[in-house]
Amino acid sequence: MVLMIVSGRSGSGKSVALRALEDMGFYCVDNLPVVLLPELANTLAARNISAAVSIDVRNMPESPEIFEHAMEQLPPSFSPQLLFLDADRNTLIRRYSDTRRLHPLSSKNLSLESAIDEESDLLEPLRSRADLIIDTSEMSVHELAEMLRTRLLGKRERELTMVFESFGFKHGIPIDADYVFDVRFLPNPHWDPKLRPMTGLDKPVASFLDRHTEVHNFIYQTRSYLELWLPMLETNNRSYLTVAIGCTGGKHRSVYVAEQLADYFRSRGKNVQSRHRTLEKRKPS
C-alpha cells in the first residue's frame, strides 16, 4: 500500500491532485497533522487501502525531525511517497488574482509576493526529499489529473518510471528534471524552410537528423550514460527519473532525441513515458 504525501506551494494544484488520487481509489485527507499519519496508516492497513494526505504551511511540522519520526512509525505495509507540486512565481500570482483567494500566510501581513517567497522557504525541507516534483505552470486542471493517473501507474507497481521530455531553452528549463541535456549544438532543421513548420515527430525532420553522425553519437553516448547509472537509480528507492532534452525552441531536435531515447529504453522493457512541453503548448484548445 502507498501513503502518498501531497505537498507544494499554495495555488500549485494540491486540491486537484487529491481529487485525482481519490478517483484512483486513495483514501484522501486534507491537512492532517503530521503526528497523526501513523495512526491513519494503521487504521487503513487493516482495510488494505492506500492513502493520500496533503501537507502545506498550515500543518507543516515545526522541525524536519518530527516528519522523519512520523515516517519511521508507519506500518511496514505502507510505502511513503512524497509528491511536490510547484509553479513559477508569476503563475501563482496570476492564479491568486484570478480566484481572489487569500494566501495562507496573508495573516502575517505579508504582500502576496512575499507570502509566496516565504512559503517556498518553509516548504523546502519537503521539496528536497520529494520523490516526484511536478511543475504545473503550463498545465490545466485536467492535464495535471491525467499526468498523475499516468505516472502513478508506475509508482504503484514499485517500478522506476523513466520520463523523457523535450523543451525549448527560450521557454526555461523544466524544474522537475533530474538530468538536463543540451542539444542546441546539433544540426538545426529550423534553417530548412520545408522543415521549419514541422516537428521532431515528423518523418522528414527525423530523416534530416538521422543523416548526421553527431546526432547518432549523442544519442548513443547519452543512453550509455543512463544505462551505466540506471541500476543504482533503480535500487535507490526512487520511482521516477526525468530526463529533459533541450534545444532552442523545443520543436525539432529535442523532440526527436527525446523520442529516440524513449523508444530505446521502452524496447529494453523499461517503464517509459515521453512528453514534449513546447508541442503541448501549441496544441489547439
Curated annotation (Swiss-Prot):
| InterPro entries per UniProt | P-loop_NTPase, RapZ-like, RapZ-like_N, RapZ_C
Q: Keywords, A to Z?
A: ATP-binding, GTP-binding, Nucleotide-binding, RNA-binding
SUPFAM superfamilies, A to Z: P-loop containing nucleoside triphosphate hydrolases
For this chain, the annotated S-S bridges are none
Under Gene3D superfamilies, the record lists: P-loop containing nucleotide triphosphate hydrolases
Task: List the GO molecular function terms.
Answer: ATP binding; GTP binding; RNA binding
Q: What does this protein do?
A: Modulates the synthesis of GlmS, by affecting the processing and stability of the regulatory small RNA GlmZ. When glucosamine-6-phosphate (GlcN6P) concentrations are high in the cell, RapZ binds GlmZ and targets it to cleavage by RNase E. Consequently, GlmZ is inactivated and unable to activate GlmS synthesis. Under low GlcN6P concentrations, RapZ is sequestered and inactivated by an other regulatory small RNA, GlmY, preventing GlmZ degradation and leading to synthesis of GlmS.
Q: NCBIfam families attached here? A: PRK05416.1 (NF003828)
Homology family: Belongs to the RapZ-like family. RapZ subfamily.
Please give the name of this protein.
RNase adapter protein RapZ
Q: Whose protein is this, by species?
A: Pectobacterium atrosepticum (strain SCRI 1043 / ATCC BAA-672)
The organism's lineage is:
Bacteria, Pseudomonadati, Pseudomonadota, Gammaproteobacteria, Enterobacterales
